[in-house]
Amino acid sequence: MSIRGARSVTRSLSCGVPQGSVLGPILYLLYTSPLGDIVRQYNMGYHFYADDTQLYLSFNSLSGDDQAYSVSQVESCVRDIDRWMSCNKLKLNRDKTELLVISSKYRPRPSLDSILVGDHRVERSDKARNIGVVFDETLSLDKHVSSVCKSALFHLRNIAKIRMYLTSESTKTLVHAYVTCRLDNCNSLLLGSPEYIIQKLQRVQNCAARLVAGQPRAAHIRPVLKELHWLPVEQRITFKVLLLTFKALNNLAPPYLSQLIVPYNPTRNLRSASKHLLEVPNVRLKSYGDRAFSVAAPKHWNDIPLDIKLSGSVDVFKSRLKTYLFRLAFS
């Protein structure tokens, strides 16, 4: 371990790694990589993150036969996974296994209520936590935002109790550590969300800003945010999406993100060819399609000035982008 130039004593490890290490999840994924072969045999999608395994399968909710076949596929796949884990000294945690059926809120609710995992029946949930994000049955993220607001307000109340003993700078540090980080975590998923969802988070940020600035609850919030140089929640979401886009275009993001955006190359020699634009795919469903990264990222990227797009590094891009969004928010 190395901290500020100081190194700990070297110790040889004959097996395993310390809990919480960066290497731990990678080694676990290498060990369990055969699970991917099992899942692919059933034509299912999957995500592996350390010991968290997610299986995905789409089906027509209006077709009883298709739904029954999908249930059979999932149960057979999980049965094979359970068998492989038992043979390789691992255990499938049935108590933490969840079933989430995602569908449009404009369609009838699918009748799938449970699946069989070994001899344990897993009932359908109305929400599931996905690496810190609460997914609901319509991907509205309403439950996630409510959870974030509840946690952030809890910490804000605790900070408020000791505010009289803190300087503004110390208060700002605590707010960033316990509140802002929660508002910003995975906030790119909220792009295109209904106004009432964004306003829930904005009210939390407003409370945090007034606490840092020592302003009363009735104080107008725009001057406070401007003085603190804080981007409002909506602009913070746009900032995160554009940052991911910049990284994807400069080979600094995972391939699964880079593959979602395509540079715009006109067939004729047009002035737009020098503007570093991205192709915007056509979508059929506005409420869901426009929120997809493959659609939202090009739209916002095409709107920002060229000098921001041509930034030479991530730090320069972030600085220029924040200045641009700040002017838009408070002009």
Residue spans for each PLM region:
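Hydrophobic/basic alpha-helical segments
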Residues: 1-331
